[in-house]
Amino acid sequence: MRLKNWAPALLFLGLFFFYPLVKILALGVDSPEFLAPESLKIAADSLGFTLWQALLSMLLTLLIGLPAAYLFARYDFRGKTLLRALTAVPFMLPTVVVAAGFNALLGARGWLNLTLMNLLNLETPPITVLYTLGAILLAHVFYNTTIVIRVVGNALSRLDPRLNEAARILGGNRWKAFWQVTFPLLRPSIFAAALLVFLFDFTSFGVILLLGGPSFATIEVEIYIQTLSMLNLPVAALLSIIQLLCTLAFSILYSRML
């Protein structure tokens, strides 16, 4: 009975998604250019940059998200509920809206540059952020900080604060009690949040294309370029397989950590 209920959806996916995908991949794999040295170099370069920017984005997100998670979990202050809710808004915004917002704030004719130009009597924008690695990292942190706040914050709120108090009674200061008691208990949730953020950054497309441009080509951006601009299906197929395998590996690792 359940299979009958799912049959139309499975048929639709098979006919309009999986079949075209398999045919396109087959066209690329059958080509002699699929594993040509040039194709492998493009794949290695895009994979290397994808891993690098995802790692940097993840570390910056943890740097901001972990203190914020501790603040929301351990302290009560006016507007806490509203502020915590607002941290989730970026995660729900479309990429185009975020890119437009960054351009309005940090672009060459954005609010920040125009303000500095008026204050300092400058003729050219003093700050260049868009179409740089910094713009990509800022956008990823903007998007994904809420993941760390919620995953780690929820785990922290479930911990008994008396554990820290007991450690301090036994002679440890607040910093030592955190590292020896709280951090080991939070380690699984921190690793889970870090891996989830890394996965989102690894598969990021719109942010990198709109704020970084083609010069910062991750695997997904390179697939877009090779397919639509270069019409190079063999390289696109190779990159798609690499992306699929990496995403599958990260997803399995994340599921094992839950």
Segments from the language model and where they lie:
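Glycine/proline-centered hinge or cleavage motifs at structural transition points of membrane proteins
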Residues: 170-171, 184
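N-terminal positioning helix adjacent to the helix-turn-helix/winged-helix DNA-binding module
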Residues: 144-148, 162, 219
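Membrane-water interface segments at the C-terminal ends of transmembrane alpha-helices
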Residues: 1-32, 41-157, 185-206, 210-212, ...
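Short alpha-helical segment immediately N-terminal to, or the first helix within
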Residues: 36-37, 155-156, 180, 210-213, ...
